[in-house]
Amino acid sequence: ASMGVNVIRLHAADAPIGEEPRSWSSCKEAPLLDYEKGNGREFHPEGLDRFDYFAAKLKERGIYLHIDLIVARDFVEGDGLDYPGNAGTCIKRFPMYNKRLIELQKEYAKKLLCHVNPYTGLALIDDPAVITVQINNEESAIKGTMETDYREDMQPYRDEVQKRFNDFLLMKYATRERLKEAWTFEGECALADNEDPVKGTVRGVDGNFYQPECEPKRDWNGEVSPARYADFMEFGITINRSF
């Protein structure tokens, strides 16, 4: 406060413990989430106390709070996931699609924001010191996910995104023929012969850590055709709005 700071962002409090960089923003002695119990659904008593105490002391000094929810949450098998294995941490766009991951995020948000801080007597949702609650950090349904492509256990989540993209295309165009017509420009068609939304085989758009890029004047039938890109972005924005 003496340096003029009036807002603090409480970032990545959900990060797991372990070796760097996996635990890049979590206290190894008392993390907020007690992953030692085999899931990420319970608070570590000391970790929650540290969180509450820090928030209260910031408030005492006139510093407002920016609360992050999901940042580096480690989704593990003990959370009761839809698919076998651990989904892992920092998986970005997938928690915006999968219903079970969304349920887990809601559960965490309710527990964190609605419990009463013993040092202030207020829950975060009622505390005027909280000026922002950020639901997701660097997350978007249109974000690239190439960093997870090498992981076989993430395939069910990638398949889920593709299925929902194909369902979106069917709602928009109804038939493969109409989709093909919409994706054709000056005799070039972006829809491959082996792609059919009825069969769920139309590929979406992927990229690296950032939103995939598209050059509007690139080859129309390229791997990221402007037509495919436009529909995938519309689809992703729809997911973002419903999240």
Regions found by a protein language model. Name each.
Residues 1-243:
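Active-site mouth of glycoside hydrolases
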